[in-house]
Regions:
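Inter-Walker segment of RecA-like/P-loop motor cores
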Residues: 1-44
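Phosphate-binding glycine-rich loops and adjacent basic patches that engage nucleotide phosphates
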Residues: 6-8, 20-28, 54-57, 114-126
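Non-catalytic, compositionally simple segments
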Residues: 15, 57-133
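Glycine-rich nucleotide phosphate-binding loop and flanking beta-alpha elements
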Residues: 36, 54, 84
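Structural motif
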Residues: 45-47, 76
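Walker B catalytic acidic pair
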Residues: 49-53
Length: 133
């Protein structure tokens, strides 16, 4: 994406393993899913994709601890539901539901959930946009 956009190329350099914002001395890179290799991070933003596939919350905890020195860190988790009710993602989903239902208040967490309504027919393709905008 960076290599084909003149606007992005002016500000960013894309390498094999990362993207660097030269004037900011910042970079974006992917990390291992092995939590033992992530200690010592000093990060401002962490994004976890498909959290339902994480067997433990080890990686998420290491990423959060790597943000403690930052004034306004941002931790973003994106996932589909998954099926494992023993996973940390299931616990997070329960918390998010409580926030969305007004049962729980948490100024540090923003929850957004896309899903069909209970009375929607999942076989009706016109309803799918609700769960996959």
């Amino acid at each position: 994406m960076v290599s084909i956009s003149p606007q992005l190329r002016r500000h960013l350099r894309a390498g094999k393993h990362d993207i660097k914002a030269l004037k900011l001395s910042a970079r974006c890179t992917y990390l291992s899913s092995e939590r033992d290799t992530l200690d010592g991070l000093n990060i401002h933003f962490a994004g976890i994709d498909e959290y339902h596939a994480h067997p433990t919350d080890g990686v998420a905890n290491v990423l959060r601890s790597g943000m403690q020195a930052r004034r306004n860190p941002l931790h973003l988790t994106i996932t589909t539901a998954g099926f494992n009710r023993e996973s940390p993602c299931y616990e997070m989903q329960k918390t998010c539901k409580e926030i969305l239902d007004g049962v729980k208040h948490d100024d540090e967490q923003f929850a957004l959930k896309y899903e069909l309504h209970e009375d929607d027919d999942w076989t009706d393709s016109s309803t799918w946009i609700k769960a996959n905008p």
